[in-house]
Amino acid sequence: SVPLVIEKIFKTKIHPQLTANAVLRGLYRIPFVRKKLHAVAGKKLLKTFGGELRMFCVGGAPLAPDVELFLREAGFPYAMGYGLTETAPLVAGTNPGKSRYRSTGPALPGTEIRIDRPDARTGEGEILIKGPTVMKGYYKDPKRTADAISRDGWFRSGDLGVFDNDGYLYIKGRLKN
């Protein structure tokens, strides 16, 4: 699902109930209380999806940090993914319980991801992708293909990212539109 779906549910239904009055807003600011409130709300949310949901996939745009925090603390079975049309579509992702806050997860098997020209201070650079799902080129557009795919076959995503020490990818923004 695109993040907008779960964000709308959280921001219009769940969060207003958890912060409905001054007392609840005060309690919500206490981390261990917030976690308990999120756990209760997460169970209710799971029931609205039929109670049998094993995985709720999120991708297509960044997930709002407060919504991801809710999903984590609620124990909601969500999984993050990253990909592009040109990569048919998924290149990195997680399974429920394996996600890391703000990360799209590690590269999928058979897919290589590297960071091009990483910044010396932050480690951020353009995300390059290589693998069997990466397109061969843009239809009848050799100039655009040459701009997007390096001579050695790496697709230039135009996205900025960085890896953690365990190979989890974090999207940091756009290099180009």
Language-model segments: residues:
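Gly/lys/ser-thr-rich phosphate-binding loops in alpha/beta enzymes
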Residues: 1-8, 175-177
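Short, flexible, glycine/charge-rich loop motifs used to bind or transfer phosphoryl groups or to couple energy/partner
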Residues: 43-47, 69, 102-104, 117-118, ...
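Active-site glycine/GP-rich loop and adjacent strand/helix microenvironment
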Residues: 61-62, 66-73, 89-95, 104-109, ...
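Conserved ATP-binding/catalytic segment of the ANL
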Residues: 107, 111-114, 121-177
